[in-house]
Each structure stands twice: as structure tokens, then as C-alpha cells.
């Protein structure tokens, strides 16, 4: 599955593929790790925010929601369609995103204690990311915090 991936930003929920991307977002992240539809629409209006659909041909393969900061980019959410997982789509997408960045790319994961969090840590390490030793607590996107 070596077809080129394309990043096409969603500008509004009326864009083609948005409903599928929103379902993938909701299914891929627990409520405390995602914003509500209302808050997400507000984020779409922020010029520092981009909600990219990751396309493989005419098929939505995944999503990458990210922010541009001064001198860096923050990759907030990356998800791959369940039927396409295990085909290096996430790796290829994140590598392409990092190559296109004009500064360092930062991201975060939940504490890598077990299961999926450890898998994510190893995934990001394989792509060249390193851990920041600082302790922090990421507040929930929605109440209650």
C-alpha cells in the first residue's frame, strides 16, 4: 500500500469527508482527550489550527489535527481508519508532516504505563521523537477536568 498520501485541510463541517473524519476522531479518542463539536468548529476558525484529512486516493485514511506555534508545530491528534491500520499510514503521514514543518514538531501522549500508551510511545520513538523528562498534567478538553 505505497500510494501517495495527501493532506487536505477541512475548513468546515460541510467539507467532503468531514463526517467520516469526525466519526474517526470520536472513535479514536476518549472524551477527555477530544473537544466537543462546538469547540472544534471554533478551533477551525483559528488560523493557527489545521484539521487535515489524510487521503489515500479518494479514501479518507486518517486525520491529523495540528497547531502552528512560533517556531514549532504541535501535532494534537493523529488517527488512522481502522481498516487501514497496520499499513504504515500513520508513520508515513507523521514523517511527511515532520518533513514539511519549518520547526520542531511536538506532541504528547498519556503516561506510558501500559498497553496502548506504551505502544504509542514506541511508535513515536521509532519515528525519532524523544521524551521530555518534565512532569505535567494535561487538562481535559471538556469539563469536568
Name every feature range the model reports, one short phrase each:
Residues 43-53:
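A short helix-loop-beta-strand connector motif used in the catalytic cores of GNAT acetyltransferases and
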Residues 139-145:
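Short, intrinsically disordered, charge-balanced linker/junction segments flanking boundaries
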Residues 100-115:
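Conserved GNAT acetyl-CoA-binding A-motif
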Residues 80, 86-99:
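Conserved acetyl-CoA-binding loop-helix of GNAT-fold acetyltransferases
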Residues 53, 58-68, 72-79:
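Conserved beta-strand in the GNAT
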Residues 1-39:
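Short amphipathic alpha-helix that is part of the acyltransferase structural core
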Residues 67-76, 85, 103, 142:
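A conserved beta-turn-beta hairpin within the catalytic core of GNAT-like acetyltransferases
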Residues 111-134, 138:
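Conserved active-site alpha-helix within GNAT-family acetyltransferase domains
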